[in-house]
């Protein structure tokens, strides 16, 4: 079993992605999987959500959740943010899946909350019990 928590200021992510297109691109590669990069680019190009604050919040949630998951999986599993995907279960609960065949892990349960400039996330990893 593993438990992780992280807290992050959304403004920190906002400043980072405003530095330059190259900084933003490198940040996306570091913290998002391919599916999430596609979703982010759709959000960014969507005229109904052009605000930088919404983009930064979307990214901050993923960074914070993945950092909490990273902590929950330590020291047994060395996974990177780009291997993780923040998803919703069929019942609507937030979760993280690991996209790497070397890590046949159960999905990690997460909880995330944001208020004003802060995002907080916690993660709980419960290894699957062997079938008897």
Swiss-Prot record:
One of its GO terms (cellular component) is mitochondrial matrix. Mg(2+) binds at residues 6, 67. Transmembrane segments: none annotated. InterPro entries: 4-PPantetheinyl_Trfase_dom (IPR008278), 4-PPantetheinyl_Trfase_dom_sf (IPR037143), ACPS (IPR002582), Ppantetheine-prot_Trfase_dom (IPR004568). HAMAP family: AcpS (MF_00101). The keyword DNA repair does not apply. GO terms for molecular function: holo-[acyl-carrier-protein] synthase activity; magnesium ion binding. Keywords: Fatty acid biosynthesis, Fatty acid metabolism, Lipid biosynthesis, Lipid metabolism, Magnesium, Metal-binding, Transferase. This is Putative holo-[acyl-carrier-protein] synthase. Disruption phenotype: Extremely slow growth at various temperatures. Transfers the 4'-phosphopantetheine moiety from coenzyme A to a Ser of acyl-carrier-protein. The keyword Metal-binding applies. The gene is new8. Its EC number is 2.7.8.7. Belongs to the P-Pant transferase superfamily. AcpS family. Coiled coil: none annotated. It catalyses: apo-[ACP] + CoA = holo-[ACP] + adenosine 3',5'-bisphosphate + H(+). Pfam families: ACPS (PF01648). It comes from Schizosaccharomyces pombe (strain 972 / ATCC 24843). GO terms for biological process: fatty acid biosynthetic process.
């Amino acid at each position: 079993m593993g438990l992780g928590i992280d807290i992050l200021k959304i403004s920190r992510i906002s400043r980072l992605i405003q530095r330059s297109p190259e900084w933003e691109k490198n940040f996306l590669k570091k913290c998002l999987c391919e599916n999430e990069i596609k979703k982010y680019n759709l959000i960014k190009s969507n005229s109904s959500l052009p605000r930088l604050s919404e983009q930064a919040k979307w990214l901050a949630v993923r960074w914070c959740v993945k950092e909490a998951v990273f902590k929950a999986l330590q020291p047994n599993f060395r996974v990177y943010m780009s291997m993780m995907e923040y998803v919703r279960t069929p019942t609507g609960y937030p979760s993280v899946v690991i996209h790497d065949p070397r890590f046949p892990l159960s999905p990690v349960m997460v909880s995330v909350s944001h208020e004003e400039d802060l995002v907080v996330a916690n993660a709980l990893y419960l290894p699957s019990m062997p079938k008897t």
